[in-house]
Amino acid sequence: MTNIRKSHPLLKIVNDSFIDLPTPSSISAWWNFGSLLGICLALQILTGLFLAMHYTSDTATAFSSVTHICRDVNYGWVLRYLHANGASMFFICLYLHVGRGLYYGSYLYKETWNVGVILLFAVMATAFMGYVLPWGQMSFWGATVITNLLSAIPYIGTSLVEWIWGSFSVDKATLTRFFAFHFLLPFIISAMVMVHLLFLHETGSNNPTGIPSNADMIPFHPYYTIKDILGLFMMITALLALVXFAPDMLGDPDNYMPANPLSTPPHIKPEWYFLFAYAILRSIPNKLGGVLALVVSILILIIIPLLHTSKQRSMTFRPISQCLFWLLVADLLTLTWIGGQPVEYPYVIIGQLASVLYFSIIIVFMPLVGLMENHLLKW
């Protein structure tokens, strides 16, 4: 008799995706982040659902409803801080996942990579709208500044901004629609994750060597389920430590002040995970140029498969490319730091240099170094 997990129409899909899935035997801990992202998404949907039961998306009561959740709802503070810090964990895993893809050449699975880039955009949009919901000072002014960037689009810009606002400023209509989209998008993201996995399972996973591993595959369960559970415990430990001991460490103190359209905070800045893109935006003195640089800084990931010049897939055996990759990481950390600093000397010039370096590494240096390594290896 056939095992039910292999014959049942629904269980068969689960079996082929998570149990009997042939997986390269050599994949390292860098391959843990996919499953961690899935768990982060599930955690965000669950905590978000319970928060939505107590939250009101009205400018008069939004701030009070968040305070009510923290003070009066049973374990409401746990839900709120799990959700807020869970977003930070989500982005840490997301950036490490993308970094892994860049380092090991996973972007050559073009369909999986492109769906992944769209997923990144969707998660960023969701996080931005979620940051507006508590209706604190930074929520209000962050929403005003970022949505206002669309006014840089020629001809239709101003109309587009007012259409998104639903008013002539960020107001009740804006908050209500942001709440609606913030609730809806994670479910769309979940569907896109399925597509992401569908494309991945068409080709199978990449591995650290970048060499096809068809001859050496092992079942996903129990080997990688156990390995993923270790990663899960480490992430949950970090998240709970953050929630229980330093819940506001990654937040902005200004967001504990109710939104006031008449008082601008001294330094308007987004959450830490958007600071690198914000620094690129600010480094260009022209509004339209800044907006284009901001969008291209993420959209550039789409063209990375086209910029791959090396005859090796992974960077494992390419030391010069490795140096360039870690320079890119250092550059992104520098941009993150600059994004949180005021617009004054020397931060402005550091931000501009880091922005130029960011685009130069990806568009110019990485393809050139790939060709150079081919030449050095006489390929």
From Swiss-Prot:
InterPro entries: Cyt_b/b6_C, Cyt_b/b6_C_sf, Cyt_b/b6_N, Cytb/b6-like_sf, Cytochrome_b, Cytochrome_b_C_euk/bac, Cytochrome_b_N_euk/bac, Di-haem_cyt_TM. GO terms for biological process: mitochondrial electron transport, ubiquinol to cytochrome c. A ubiquinone binds at residue 201. Binds 2 heme b groups non-covalently. Gene3D superfamilies: Cytochrome Bc1 Complex, Chain C. Pfam families: Cytochrom_B_C (PF00032), Cytochrome_B (PF00033). PROSITE patterns: CYTB_CTER, CYTB_NTER. Keywords: Electron transport, Heme, Iron, Membrane, Metal-binding, Mitochondrion, Mitochondrion inner membrane, Respiratory chain, Transmembrane, Transmembrane helix, Transport, Ubiquinone. Component of the ubiquinol-cytochrome c reductase complex (complex III or cytochrome b-c1 complex) that is part of the mitochondrial respiratory chain. The b-c1 complex mediates electron transfer from ubiquinol to cytochrome c. Contributes to the generation of a proton gradient across the mitochondrial membrane that is then used for ATP synthesis. The cytochrome bc1 complex contains 11 subunits: 3 respiratory subunits (MT-CYB, CYC1 and UQCRFS1), 2 core proteins (UQCRC1 and UQCRC2) and 6 low-molecular weight proteins (UQCRH/QCR6, UQCRB/QCR7, UQCRQ/QCR8, UQCR10/QCR9, UQCR11/QCR10 and a cleavage product of UQCRFS1). This cytochrome bc1 complex then forms a dimer. Heme 1 (or BL or b562) is low-potential and absorbs at about 562 nm, and heme 2 (or BH or b566) is high-potential and absorbs at about 566 nm. This is Cytochrome b. It comes from Cnephaeus nilssonii (Northern bat). The gene is MT-CYB.
